[in-house]
Curated annotation (Swiss-Prot):
Gene Ontology MF annotations: 2-isopropylmalate synthase activity; acetyl-CoA C-acetyltransferase activity; manganese ion binding
Pfam family, one: HMGL-like
Protein name according to UniProt: 2-isopropylmalate synthase
Classification via SUPFAM superfamilies: 2-isopropylmalate synthase LeuA, allosteric (dimerisation) domain, Aldolase
Organism: Burkholderia pseudomallei (strain K96243)
Regulatory domain as annotated region, ranges: 396-515
InterPro entries for this protein: 2-IPM_HCS-like, 2-isopropylmalate_synth_dimer, AIPM/Hcit_synth_CS, Aldolase_TIM, LeuA/HCS_post-cat, LeuA_allosteric_dom_sf, LeuA_bact_synth, PYR_CT
Names of required cofactors: Mn(2+)
Ranges where the Pyruvate carboxyltransferase domain occurs: 5-268
Gene3D superfamilies with a match to the protein in the record: 1.10.238.260, 3.30.160.270, Aldolase class I (3.20.20.70)
Subunit text: Homodimer.
Source domain of life: Bacteria
Family: Belongs to the alpha-IPM synthase/homocitrate synthase family. LeuA type 1 subfamily.
Length: 515
């Protein structure tokens, strides 16, 4: 048995199913490249058959990310598997991940199929996938609630057909650690050809035990792959948190005895990137990546840490990518200093043109803000990448003018482009942000409902840039938009337009759990 634990990240597929977490193609590529920098073993880039947008994103990631295995989900049918294979063709290394439900409840109520029909479909799906690759993963959906004898029969058959990874999914987060770990162990013991496949765990956090269940699957069950997401992103209560799995296995190597290929210094940058793109704020007390994860308020604890860090710290903040919030650049800093700091932060831009554009944004910010922090630099790059993506978007922010006097309703004028043609919307509102949104809607008329408006300061002080998240809903579809600017109202306009672009761009995608 291998002593390496494979990290399978599904932020771009299962994580995106969290309401409001839909991402553009460009955003998915940025996250995939960060996962590659982190040396994630397998990146599940999407569900190719769900939409043309997902297919394109998987295909582009497969062509650009070369150091990780790229994977696509596919239902257990020839059409889905063919679509996945077509999207993955440019990859250096790829995997097809096919699945079908095996629990009595799912077979009867969702699939309306008999166990024998499910057995045959699973077997034939893996056989068809073998035409494209030897790297095939099979998941019995809702496996933790499946009949043991039937589950063993199905898994033995798909391994015989060529499945090289068997993923035991706790789809609804029903498992508890001891039982789930023993489930994986029992399957490995009872299936005669189990040694021909790596067993994997995929847990959801409905009862708050996704990480505990996954670790039990590894320690008790002998699983050697964990499926997880950055920040535990996912629908309902989320998925297994990548950062918690990685640091638990690394910190307690004395207990787990497993090696990892992950560059842990890229964990916090990945967490911040996913949070910024999705608009899902990381709770301050979140393990590893929360703002308070390495903070000590107790006087006794502070004294101990000052004398010897290992008195109260079992991990070092710098080992997971935390850096001091220090002033690094100012308006007199040159292009080379800016480029060097980007490299130190692990931020890469694809071309000199992008670097020049980001540096121009930096100089503009430095004229308005005396102190530039690392977080500002990351926001600048994010803003530039978003602007490049918006070149092909339906709506593009241009400018904002506003007027507000005590006792009068604020007025706003927003200039933005619609497919390249500039329009100007003017309106009043209960406040400057309300007026700005109303001004945009005078030209757009989206009919979307505003579900969430939140503001977060990127750094400290009155000159801090504001990061605004806007969540919109229309026809049952929920999207997030994020905008940054030292002017909160301008950041709000950018966020609103970003959300509108997401509403406009992608038709509803198939959800594999409901397909």
């Amino acid at each position: 048995m291998t002593d390496k634990l494979i990290i399978f990240d599904t932020t771009l597929r299962d994580g995106e199913q969290s309401p409001g977490a839909s991402m553009t193609k460009e955003e998915k590529i940025r996250i995939a490249k960060q996962l590659e920098r982190m040396k994630v073993d397998v990146i599940e880039a999407g569900f190719a058959a769900s939409s043309n947008g997902d297919f394109d994103a998987i295909q582009t990631i497969a062509s650009q990310v070369k150091d990780s295995t790229i994977c696509s989900l596919a239902r257990a049918n020839d059409k889905d598997i063919q679509r996945a294979a077509d999207a993955l063709k440019p990859a250096n290394s790829f995997r097809i991940h096919t699945f079908i439900a095996t629990s009595p409840l799912h077979m009867e109520k969702k699939l309306r199929m008999t166990p024998d029909q499910v057995f045959e479909q699973a077997r034939l799906a893996v056989r068809f996938a073998r035409k494209f690759t030897d790297n095939i993963e099979f998941s019995p959906e809702d496996g933790s609630r499946s009949d043991m004898d039937f589950l063993c029969r199905v898994l033995e058959a798909v391994i015989a057909e060529g499945a090289t990874t068997i993923n035991i999914a706790d789809t609804v987060g029903y498992g508890v650690p001891e039982l789930y770990g023993n489930l994986v162990k029992t399957l490995r013991e009872r299936i005669p050809n189990s040694d021909k496949a790596i067993f994997s765990v995929h847990c959801h956090n409905d009862l708050g035990m996704a990480v505990a269940n996954s670790l039990a699957g590894v320690k008790i069950g002998g699983a050697r792959q964990v499926e997880c997401t950055i920040n535990g992103l996912g629908e309902r209560a989320g998925n297994t948190s990548l950062e918690e799995i990685v640091m638990a296995v690394k910190t307690r190597k004395d207990y787990f005895g497993l090696d990892l290929g992950i560059d842990t210094t890229q964990i916090v940058p990945a967490s911040k990137l996913v949070s910024q793109i999705t608009g899902f704020v990381v709770q301050p007390n979140k393990a590893v990546v929360g703002a308070n994860a390495f903070a000590h308020a107790s006087g006794i604890h502070q004294d101990g840490v000052l004398k010897a860090r290992d008195t109260y710290e079992i991990m070092r903040a710098e080992d997971v990518g935390w850096t001091a919030n220090k002033i690094v650049l100012g308006k007199l800093s040159g292009r080379n200093a800016f480029k060097q700091r980007l490299q130190e932060l692990g931020v890469s831009l694809d071309s000199e043109a992008e670097l020049n554009a980001a540096f121009a944004r930096f100089k503009d910010l430095a004229d308005r803000k005396a102190e530039i922090f690392d977080e500002d630099i990351i926001a600048i790059v994010t803003e530039e990448e978003s602007a490049l993506a918006q070149e092909h978007e339906h709506y593009k922010f241009v400018s904002l003018a506003q007027r507000s006097e005590t006792g009068e309703r604020p007025q706003a004028k927003v200039v933005f482009a619609v497919d390249g043609d500039e329009v100007a919307g003017e309106a009043s509102g209960n406040g400057p942000v309300d007026a700005t949104f109303n001004a945009i809607e005078t030209e757009v008329g989206s009919g979307a409902e505003l579900l969430l408006y939140s503001v977060n300061a990127i750094t400290t002080g009155t000159q801090a840039q504001g990061e605004v998240t806007v969540r919109l809903s229309k026809s049952g579809r929920i999207v997030n938009g994020v905008g940054t600017d030292p002017d909160i109202v301008a950041a709000s306009a950018k966020a609103y337009i970003a959300a509108l672009n997401k509403l406009y761009s992608n038709a509803d995608k198939l959800n594999p759990q409901r397909a």
